[in-house]
């Protein structure tokens, strides 16, 4: 269990009489001691909502997902551990709310934890709750603001003697607590599934190992046929702070991994071979897009529409014509009738609001951005709907690739 010392928030409340002095040195910080007491907790997604106190019944986000990352290139976190992604309150049918309370959107998570006497928690998060871009604080802020604010039992009114940002501490503390009980790396290793540059595994092998440890199936996510994420699903009897987490079946979207040939890439770099029969071939970039053409989207094993002039993914109608202009020998820029194109705020967009064009390249015939040929979206467009394309995976569930169809 993580150890803590009283922070300024606790000391201030003790001195002003809001907390007894004896309580500020209480070593057990696994859950808030002044959160709402629930006499007869009901299990979320099993009991029907009929007006229960949502301080004791997680609603509407009653399906809790503890999500973990395996980032191998670039390597993120310890070589023998997965890292934390977040704790997400899904609806029982797989949908979800996001950014539920603008008044509780914080940008100082580290300071909040330290001021609450949880420097121990911050230290652990700095090792195991990692952002692949290197900005851990930004990831923590994103997870709280997008997901934490949507957990009903973390509302400030659910505390008998609330101190500022107490619910933020509870969110990160509970996420770490659940993560520590789900050692994905060790669970897979116990089943003979270990990172390797040569071995591959089946989806059934991976699912069997993780489901046995979790006591319920899990959601397994891949990127370019390689293990990338695991989602553990729970329902909760009572509040997030003090309730019982019960393993549950996955909701909503299932795995995107192939049935066989799944790679589990080591985080540490491959050691060079001392002897080789033939020299290795360097990776080369493809011929840059040029002239005028369409940006064709492929996803889920087939062609799925194209990109229209403002940079959105569209499945119906006419594809936009883009101009590819040479930037260097290996790179080029893109422009539509609306204007130049770039990733702004991680989202692909074209228009007069874009101030500087992005440089792209080609790998294996696919559009490449910063070395990646896989892009992401929240959903595949249908009918007249359009979808935003993102450069990083984050929590975007659809993988896609973009190719060029030259127009003459």
From Swiss-Prot:
Reaction equation(s) it catalyzes: a ribonucleotidyl-ribonucleotide-RNA + H2O = a 3'-end 3'-phospho-ribonucleotide-RNA + a 5'-end dephospho-ribonucleoside-RNA + H(+)
Keywords assigned by UniProt, alphabetized: Cytoplasm, Disulfide bond, Endonuclease, Glycoprotein, Hydrolase, Lyase, Nuclease, Signal, Vacuole
Gene Ontology terms for molecular function: ribonuclease T2 activity; RNA binding; RNA endonuclease activity
Coiled coil segments of this chain: none
Cellular component terms (Gene Ontology): extracellular region; vacuolar lumen
One Pfam family from the record: RNaseT2L_C
Disulfide bonds: 38-56, 45-92, 55-158, 100-150, 222-257
EC number: 4.6.1.19
Spans annotated as Disordered: 268-292
GO biological process, one term: RNA catabolic process
Active site (UniProt): 85, 143, 147
InterPro entries xrefs: Ribonuclease_T2_eukaryotic, RNase_T2-like, RNase_T2-like_sf, RNase_T2_His_AS_1, RNase_T2_His_AS_2
Localisation per UniProt entry: Vacuole lumen; Cytoplasm
Glycosylation sites: 108, 173, 372
Enzyme class: lyase
Signal peptide: 1-25
Feature: compositional bias, Low complexity: 275-288
Family stated for the protein in its record: Belongs to the RNase T2 family.
Function: Rnase which modulates cell survival under stress conditions. Released from the vacuole to the cytoplasm during stress to promote tRNA and rRNA cleavage and to activate separately a downstream pathway that promotes cell death. Involved in cell size, vacuolar morphology and growth at high temperatures and high salt concentration.
Protein name, as recorded: Ribonuclease T2-like
Organism annotation: Aspergillus fumigatus (strain ATCC MYA-4609 / CBS 101355 / FGSC A1100 / Af293) (Neosartorya fumigata)
Classification of source organism: Eukaryota, Fungi, Dikarya, Ascomycota, Pezizomycotina
Gene that produces this protein: rny1
